[in-house]
């Protein structure tokens, strides 16, 4: 899969999202926005995280999920169940996690503003993504 950085990019977002088998694939990175698609296996999760200066939009294309959010890492308590066609807007600074509660892969796409990942980022698994993020944050 090739990323289409800073060029007009027309796509079937539902097909791109459902056909993605990687934990995370960056499809497009612009000056102020980034598009990624994710496939989260049954029983797995994105992982509790916060983007200090990045707003995030998530949309579920397939599967079922539980969204958990909170103002601090210790106070994550607000929950919502997500089904296909549900979208979530997560303001910068909000702790959040998306947990796959279904029996099949959860397929979501995400818009970050500004970009959260390096252009062209592909993480085949959550473990690969966690290791890369630990390196980025000097935790490895």
Where on the chain are the PLM-derived regions?
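A short, N-terminal "cap"/entry segment at the start of jelly-roll beta-barrel domains
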Residues: 1-34, 47, 80-83, 124-140
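A short hydrophobic beta-strand segment most commonly corresponding to one strand
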Residues: 57, 103-120
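Short acidic-glycine-tyrosine-enriched beta hairpin
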Residues: 72-91
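A generic "binding-loop/recognition-motif" signal
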Residues: 33, 42, 53, 94-95, ...
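Short hydrophobic/aromatic-rich beta-strand segments that constitute the beta-sheet cores
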Residues: 37, 67-69, 108
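Conserved short histidine dyad/triad with adjacent acidic residue
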Residues: 21, 37-52
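Glycine- and acidic-residue-biased ligand/ion/polar-headgroup-sensing regions
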Residues: 53-71
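Short beta-strand His + acidic residue motifs that chelate non-heme Fe in jelly-roll/DSBH
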Residues: 46-48, 67-68, 90, 96-102
């Amino acid at each position: 899969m090739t990323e289409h950085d800073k060029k007009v990019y027309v796509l079937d977002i539902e097909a791109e999202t459902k056909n993605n088998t990687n934990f995370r694939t960056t499809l497009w990175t612009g000056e102020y926005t980034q598009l990624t698609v994710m496939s989260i296996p049954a029983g797995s999760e994105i992982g509790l995280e916060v983007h200090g200066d990045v707003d995030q939009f998530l949309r579920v294309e397939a599967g079922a999920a539980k969204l958990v959010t909170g103002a601090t890492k210790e106070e994550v308590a607000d929950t919502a169940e997500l089904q296909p066609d549900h979208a979530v807007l997560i303001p910068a600074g909000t702790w959040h996690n998306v947990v796959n509660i279904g029996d099949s892969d959860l397929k979501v796409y995400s818009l970050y503003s500004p970009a959260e990942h390096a252009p062209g980022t592909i993480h085949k698994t959550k473990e690969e993504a966690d290791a890369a993020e630990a390196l980025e944050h000097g935790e490895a």
